Amino acid sequence: MASFKIVIVCLALLVAVASARRRDMMSDDELDYHFSKRGIPCACDSDGPDIRSASLSGIVWMGSCPSGWKKCKSYYSIVADCCNQ
């Protein structure tokens, strides 16, 4: 009886693995959009001096800003930059 249960479980796993579908690859534009929305918001110089009322229009990028983005903070940081499009 135990071997019958093992066979049933193995068949169920085989069906689950065989019927799994691969995700379609996203285009570069879709990836850029999703990455830009996953970042940590930051306040650009244009948002004003008060952080509590700022709109936080920038996104923190590790290293430097990617292509199509510009640095929007006046201070320099080696680790990350506050960037916006």
Curated annotation (Swiss-Prot):
SUPFAM superfamilies per UniProt: Defensin-like
Outcome of swapping F35L: In Nv1-7 and Nv1-12
Keywords: Cleavage on pair of basic residues, Disulfide bond, Ion channel impairing toxin, Neurotoxin, Secreted, Signal, Toxin, Voltage-gated sodium channel impairing toxin
Tissue specificity statement from the Swiss-Prot or TrEMBL entry: Expressed in ectodermal glands and in clumps outside of the extodermal layer. Is not expressed in nematocytes. In adult female tissues, shows similar expression levels in mesenteries (gametes-producing tissue), tentacles, pharynx and physa.
UniProt propeptide residues: 21-36
Pfam families xref list: Toxin_4 (PF00706)
Annotated disulfide bonds: C42-C82, C44-C72, C65-C83
Compartment(s): Secreted
InterPro entries: Myo_ane_neurotoxin_sf
Leader sequence segment: 1-20
Key word Signal present: yes
Source taxon at top rank: Eukaryota
GO molecular function: sodium channel regulator activity; toxin activity
Family: Belongs to the sea anemone sodium channel inhibitory toxin family. Type II subfamily.
Job of this protein: Binds to site 3 of voltage-gated sodium channels and inhibits the inactivation process. Is highly active on DmNav1/TipE (drosophila) and is only extremely weakly active on rat Nav1.4-beta-1/SCN4A-SCN1B, and on human Nav1.5-beta-1/SCN5A-beta-1. This reveals high specificity for arthropod over mammalian channels. In vivo, when released into the medium, this recombinant toxin induces impaired swimming, paralysis and death of the crustacean A.nauplii within several hours. Also causes paralysis of cherry shrimps immediately after injection at very low doses.
Note: Nv1 toxin seems to be encoded by 8 different genes. 4 of them code for identical precursors, whereas 4 others code for very similar precursors. In the genome draft, 6 additional loci are also correlated to Nv1 toxin, but they are not predicted to be functional genes. This high similarity may be explained by concerted evolution. The primary structure of the mature peptide is identical in 9 entries (AC B1NWS4, AC B1NWS1, AC B1NWR6, AC P0CH90, AC P0CH46, AC B1NWS8, AC A7SCE5, AC B1NWR7 and AC P0CH45). Additional information can be found in entry AC B1NWS4.
Listed name of the protein: N.vectensis toxin 1 2
